[in-house]
A protein has these predicted regions:
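Glycine-rich beta-alpha loop elements in corrinoid/cobalamin-binding modules
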Residues: 1-87
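Canonical Radical SAM [4Fe-4S] cluster-binding loop centered on the CxxxCxxC motif
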Residues: 4, 81-122
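Anion (oxyanion) recognition and catalysis
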Residues: 2, 149, 210, 241-244
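Catalytic cores of alpha/beta
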Residues: 230-242
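Conserved small/polar residues in nucleotide/adenosyl-binding loops
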Residues: 257-258
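Core AdoMet radical
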Residues: 28-32, 102-205, 216-226, 249-253
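Residue-level recognition of beta-strand->loop/alpha-helix junctions
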Residues: 10-14, 223, 254
Length: 259
């Protein structure tokens, strides 16, 4: 819309505010998670004709479907003027098929979509936030790693690395780049341990990272809680304590916890 000369306003409110310039020609709403569905329904009630979508609504109504383009990678940074970095995807899709995740259904098998050069905004810090769900699932991951190193970029693997699929080669590749947290204030690598049954394969991957020179203290581990059937508090604490003992930073995600 902005490219067509339209004025665009970003709002996190579903109801009209007193200071808003009305009326709007188009209203769009998007939600990431399904528990926000009620807010999208409120948006539709408040703004007749509003177009809604996102993974919290359904997986059919996408930006790409609306504008009839295969991939949409053109970000309007002007709506976040204080954000100094660059962000985007070098790949889409995922090799895994986790029951709680919409990515395989929405994006399919892994494929390369952009280079680091495509993502980085010249004139801004050489800091790139990658939104890839399975960076090493793409066939061109070596080219992207070389591009990160050759360009002296700092990179945040924001959506995490699949530790269950780490190999000595990919661990060495991660260690060879300046991986950072998403604020670029320190060294951080994100991954996940979703259930107790993954214990052996998780620590196998962590060991490979350690052997490549990545210390456990750099690794933040998202702990999904409440999704595994009949999960007990003892099992949850076992994961938490093992991560602490290994020197990792556990990050419990209790969004699905119900009892």
């Amino acid at each position: 819309h902005r490219a067509q000369g339209d004025d665009v306003t970003l709002s996190r409110f579903v109801q009209p505010r007193l200071d808003e310039k009305l009326p709007y020609d188009r209203i769009y709403g998007s939600a990431i998670f399904s528990w926000s569905r009620g807010k999208l329904e409120d948006l539709q009630n408040a703004w007749l004709g509003a177009m809604v979508g996102g993974t919290g609504w359904d997986t059919e109504q996408t930006v790409e479907a609306v504008i009839r383009e295969p991939e949409y990678e053109y970000y309007d940074y002007s709506i976040y003027p204080e954000f100094p970095y660059s962000l985007g995807f070098t790949q889409r899709g995922c090799r895994l098929n986790c029951g709680f995740c919409v990515v395989p259904k929405k994006e399919g098998k892994p494929r390369s979509v952009n280079t680091i050069k495509d993502i980085w905004r010249p004139g801004t810090p050489r800091c790139v936030v990658l939104l890839d769900n399975d960076f090493f699932g793409q066939t061109q991951w070596k080219e992207r790693i070389d591009e990160i190193k050759d360009g002296d970029f700092r990179v945040s693997f924001n959506q995490g690395i699949n530790v269950r699929m780490i190999t000595p080669e990919t661990a060495e590749a991660i260690a060879s780049v300046k991986y950072s947290d998403d604020q670029f204030k320190g060294r951080r690598l994100y991954t996940a341990w979703d259930n107790l049954g993954q214990e052996k394969v998780f620590f196998r991957g962590l060991t490979m990272l350690n052997e490549a020179g990545i210390p456990s203290k750099h690794v933040m581990v998202y702990m999904l809680i409440g999704y595994a059937p009949n999960e007990t508090m003892d099992e949850i604490l076992h994961r938490f304590n093992r991560l602490n003992e290994a020197g990792c930073l556990p990050y419990p995600i209790c969004l699905l916890y119900t009892s």
